[in-house]
Amino acid sequence: MSEDKPEGATHLQNEKPPDEEIEPEELLEVAARALSARASLPDPTDQILLSPNYTSGWPAGAPEGVTIHTEEGWHDPSVAWLRNPKSFASAHFCIRRDGKIVQLVWERDRAWHARSSGMYYFGIEHEGGSGLGDVPILWKTGRNADDLRDDDHMLIQSARLVAYLCTKHDIRIQHDFERPPVRDSVSHIAGHDQMMGNDHQDPGPEFPWRAYMRRVERFANM
């Protein structure tokens, strides 16, 4: 894909995804993922539905972090839109409210999920909204984050995925709770609202960052 394709996320629409089968070389990628997982945490991905919207490879020094998004919509139409070439948008992963993790872009490639700083970060979308629009928040309050035993399946699986990515790719498990733009902070796990060069506000002020980061750290140390 060309470098000048837009990389900003858009409002997600209910579009039919392109028909697509996993090619033989992509099966090799799945095998490589399994081998890599032996040296890191288990890969928690449940399903692979590849998007054509990506840029091959990463810039030097990347990936260096993870961006947390909300879909501002529902899971199935969101995944469909991010797999539609007309959207010029994608994410590495989308997580459904019940915790199902769908991968859209290989870890070796760049997804189109945030302008500027996004080219250095993995992108993870979460079903529902940020609380700043018409789409409701679908995560829970983050209670019992220390023992990982509450019913917030989406954010528990999200934390598990982030811990996997951080341990595999040597990304620091760190979030700047003062919330400055990511290039002015030490956040390696950041909200979309912290990405430089964009005007998005997700995951919103109600996102339970402290509980979420405790979960990521717990999973990384299991």
Residue ranges and their predicted role:
Residues 115-134:
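Short coil-to-beta-strand
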